[in-house]
Design a protein with these regions (language model features):
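A short, well-ordered alpha-helix in the C-terminal region of glycosyltransferases
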Residues: 343-357
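Glycosyltransferases and closely related glycan-assembly transferases
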Residues: 87-100, 107-123, 136, 140
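Conserved nucleotide-sugar phosphate-binding/catalytic loop shared by glycosyltransferases and other
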Residues: 3-10, 30-85, 231-233, 323
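C-terminal alpha-helical cap of glycosyltransferases
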Residues: 356-373
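Active-site-proximal region of nucleotide-activated glycan assembly enzymes
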Residues: 2, 32, 53, 116-179
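Acidic donor-binding loop of glycosyltransferase active sites
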Residues: 97-99, 263, 267-281, 289-290
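Structural loop-to-beta junction motif characteristic of Rossmann-like glycosyltransferase folds
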Residues: 52, 120-121, 270-271, 288-296, ...
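Donor-nucleotide binding loops and adjacent catalytic segments primarily
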Residues: 46, 178-183, 187-272, 305-309, ...
Length: 373
């Protein structure tokens, strides 16, 4: 069988596609896979790292601004949609897939629209409780809509198309024990690791907080810190810390632009500091990781805060709102949690209770079903 996946923009859209493709590859070893992504975006780097071919489409997002610059950008985007639709149609005709699957990002629209008009079976996965603009636009075109939450059904005009699957997690997240992961990262089994990661693109405000927090560490804090700054912010974080905390190794700090070995790093983590995107939550619940969440305020309908409050209510997360804490208060909370093994254990159990471990298999079943129609 042949499958086309389309996804892009952030790891939260890319990783679910990689998870499903990886499982399909195990179930159907002779299958062929092709990814379509947005030119110059993160998927063009992450997908080939997993061994898949990806072709770029010239597609850009819509700006919600109302000024002349935003209008000009949106006019260019509309032109790019037409061009990328034609490109996608030609690629689909040439590849002849049995199904086309989208997992989020604006590149999904022209690809799934083209597949639909060519009568190729289509499915889209929406990991957030509230669908994004692209998913809304595709709802009437695709054959199946797979969602992460039961409450999501209400947002779709044809609920009979909607199947609750959970959000898929890559198989690599089951590949490491905590002790093995710590050993490979150069840590002893009893050394604590705090992982700080704020979305695949990074987050400006949280990088400011972390550049203020890191100089407060002197190497005797009782834990190692691994901070992923994100490609956009990494140079600025490095420049700042050269002045305020030049000896990162002595402070037990590992600063990275991007955490490419996320399954290993998360397996080793004793506590995670992060955003509340749906894909991140799926990975954290799958691994049962205690978490301090700072939901992004820059998302539609505050869906990240809603995601985080579910975890908080279950007892697996502490939720802090951006702008309502500083580096010192965050460090104080980190220290308090790491000092309370019983609390960490209960948070871990609560996170694990929310996992949907068979989400990837559910989605693969749906994809194979439509491909065989």
């Amino acid at each position: 069988m042949k499958f086309i996946f389309t996804c892009g923009g952030t790891a939260g859209h890319i990783n679910p596609a990689l998870a499903v493709a990886g499982r399909l590859k195990e179930l159907l070893p002779d299958s062929e896979f092709l990814f379509l992504g947005a030119e110059g975006k993160m998927e063009m780097e992450l997908v080939p790292r997993e061994g898949y071919q990806i072709k770029p489409l010239k597609i850009t997002n819509l700006s919600r601004g109302k000024n002349l610059k935003a209008l000009s950008h949106n006019l260019a985007t509309l032109k790019n949609v037409v061009v990328s639709y034609r490109e996608a149609k030609a690629i689909i005709r040439d590849f002849q897939p049995d199904a086309v699957i989208g997992t989020g990002g604006y590149v999904c629209y022209p690809v799934l629209k083209a597949a639909s008009q060519l009568h190729i079976p289509t499915a889209v996965h929406e990991s957030n409780a509230v669908p994004g603009l692209t998913t809304k636009m595709l709802a009437k075109l695709v054959d199946r809509i797979m969602v992460g939450f039961e409450e999501s059904r209400q947002y779709y005009p044809q609920p009979e198309k909607v199947i609750v699957t959970g959000t898929p997690v890559r198989g690599q997240f089951a590949a490491y024990t905590k002790a093995q992961a710590k050993r490979e990262l150069g840590l002893a089994a009893d050394e604590k690791l705090v992982v700080s990661v704020w979305g695949s693109l990074g987050a400006g405000h949280m990088n400011v907080i972390m550049t203020e927090l890191i100089p407060l560490l002197d190497g005797t804090q009782g834990f190692h810190l691994l901070h992923g700054a994100g490609k956009m912010y990494y140079p600025g974080v490095c420049e700042s810390l050269v002045k305020t905390a030049p000896d990162l190794t002595g402070r037990k700090v590992d600063l990275r632009e991007y955490i490419f070995d996320m399954p290993r790093v998360m397996a080793a983590a004793d506590l995670v500091l992060c955003r509340a995107g749906a894909s991140t939550i799926s990975e954290l619940t799958y691994m049962g990781k205690p978490v301090i969440m700072v939901p992004s305020p820059n998302v539609t309908n505050h869906h990240q805060e809603r995601n985080a409050r579910v975890l908080e209510k279950a007892g697996g997360a502490k939720v802090l709102l951006e702008g309502e804490f500083d580096a010192q208060s965050l460090l104080k909370l980190v220290r308090e949690l790491l000092a309370d093994e019983e609390k960490l254990s209960s948070m871990s159990a609560a996170m694990g209770s929310l996992a949907v471990p068979d989400a990837t298999d559910k989605i693969c079943g749906i994809v194979m079903d439509i491909a065989n129609q």
